[in-house]
């Protein structure tokens, strides 16, 4: 089974979750989508309105073919000689409504990876909304004055560095500040939503090879708690952020 994005949109049965998020699952033999409804419902109701008319489609395989993408239900290796490449997701942001497509087979046996991908992209779309999140922005300003602080991702760290350097030269930093706010909010919001759905371990959020300093744990929790106040968890969900994975005691080895 192969179909274009247009064919997928015409043939898929779209559902509206209780939080207002629109989604659909394109199923095929061997595709496990049992966790999708609860994952979608984890997006706080007060946040779902910020993603506008975004529609999320969960498909078996998502392949890049030339300049376009196709949806496949077959377990087949992408034909690289034909310009095919397996994709984890596709996000098309448009004013009239964004389209997010995520490959379930790409994240087969990796429910954590699937959740982080989904919530990160929802967080990014939400960060594009024009309304101000003053409480969160003020927190970022306070943390920016702390020279010890880091960020969740290199992108946010780079934008923050530009803001600090531009301000130090007495230059206007509005564009860099907007980009920093967006990057930092996307990072924290994605982790916050993921932590409503599954256990998130703070130490797993960073790559050992990254050159930028990681955010301090207490500053990370301040960001997450601020977002929790702005976007309370839906009924049946609660924040599950753990600082460190449990270690096996020597007596149990």
Regions found by a protein language model. Name each.
Residues 100, 108-120, 125, 179, ...:
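Active-site alpha-helix of zinc metalloproteases
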Residues 17-111:
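Auxiliary, metal-adjacent structural segments of Zn-dependent hydrolase domains
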Residues 1-16, 172-253:
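Pan-zinc metallopeptidase signature
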Residues 52-61, 132-133, 153-159, 241:
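Short glycine-rich, low-complexity/disordered patches
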Residues 112-113, 124-164, 202-210:
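Post-HEXXH active-site segment of zinc metalloproteases
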Residues 166-172:
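Acidic/His metal-coordination segments adjacent to aromatic residues that form catalytic metal sites
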């Amino acid at each position: 089974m192969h179909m274009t994005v247009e064919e997928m949109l015409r043939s898929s049965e779209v559902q509206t979750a209780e939080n207002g998020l629109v989604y659909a699952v394109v199923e095929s033999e061997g595709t496990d989508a049992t966790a999708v409804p609860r994952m979608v419902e984890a997006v706080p109701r007060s946040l779902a309105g910020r993603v506008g008319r975004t529609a999320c489609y969960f498909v078996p395989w998502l392949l890049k073919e030339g300049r376009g993408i196709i949806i496949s239900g077959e377990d087949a290796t992408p034909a690289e000689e034909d310009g095919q490449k397996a994709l984890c997701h596709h996000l098309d942001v448009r004013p009239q409504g964004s389209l997010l497509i995520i490959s379930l087979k790409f994240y087969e046996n990796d429910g954590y990876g699937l959740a982080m991908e989904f919530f990160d992209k929802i967080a990014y779309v939400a960060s594009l909304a024009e309304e101000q999140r003053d409480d969160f922005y003020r927190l970022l300003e306070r943390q920016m004055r702390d020279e010890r602080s880091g960020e969740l991702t290199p992108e946010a760290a780079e934008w923050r560095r530009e803001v600090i350097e531009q301000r130090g030269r007495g230059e206007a930093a509005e564009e860099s500040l907007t980009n920093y706010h967006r990057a930092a909010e996307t990072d924290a919001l994605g982790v916050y939503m993921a932590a409503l759905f599954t256990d998130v371990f703070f130490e797993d959020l960073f790559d050992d090879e990254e050159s930028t300093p990681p955010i301090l744990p207490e500053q990370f929790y301040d960001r997450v708690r601020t977002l929790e106040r702005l976007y309370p968890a839906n009924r049946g969900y609660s924040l599950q952020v753990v600082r460190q994975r449990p270690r096996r005691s020597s007596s149990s080895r």
